[in-house]
């Protein structure tokens, strides 16, 4: 899986879900096309950011806090942005070992893997990428007139920013 494929996949998954919800709310409200397009862009960017956050939390979150077992994506052989970043940075031997274990669904020592990913900057790069998507979502709102609704949408982006910062 390449990063390009990863981004396409999460845009078609979570990004599209958020985008549809946001754009449909604008369409139902009989807003101009520019507004519904801005809402689509907002939802797509926010949903993509949220999926990256979810992928990061799957590695570094607290099971009590997130209510699910950590490392489930890795157990299923799913490559997420933090792991793709790590594979990019790994030397050929590390890359071979990690890839083989993921493909064969062999257990990985999650704390050690996360430590390596943090040391190599893979986690912070994934968080930074998600933060950029959040910023893009916030920028999409600039096309909307100021209102309580627009401010509520903007506040959602700040909430996601806080979630991301909590992963650092």
Stretch-by-stretch model annotation:
Residues 1-168:
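All-alpha prenyltransferase/terpene-synthase fold signal
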């Amino acid at each position: 899986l390449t990063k390009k494929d990863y981004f396409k996949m999460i845009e078609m998954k979570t990004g599209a879900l958020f985008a549809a919800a946001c754009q449909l709310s604008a369409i139902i409200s009989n807003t101009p096309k520019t507004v519904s397009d801005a809402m689509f862009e907002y939802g797509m960017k926010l949903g993509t950011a949220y999926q990256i956050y979810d992928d990061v939390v799957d590695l570094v979150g607290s099971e009590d806090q997130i209510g699910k077992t950590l490392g489930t994506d890795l157990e299923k052989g799913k490559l997420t942005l933090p792991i793709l970043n790590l594979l990019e940075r790994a030397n050929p031997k590390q890359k071979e070992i990690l890839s083989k274990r993921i493909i064969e669904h062999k257990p990985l020592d999650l704390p050690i893997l996360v430590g390596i990913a943090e040391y190599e900057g893979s986690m912070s790069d994934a968080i930074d990428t998600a933060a950029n998507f959040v910023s893009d979502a916030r920028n999409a709102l600039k096309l909307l007139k100021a209102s309580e609704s627009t401010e509520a949408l903007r506040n959602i982006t700040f909430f996601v920013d806080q979630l991301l910062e909590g992963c650092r």
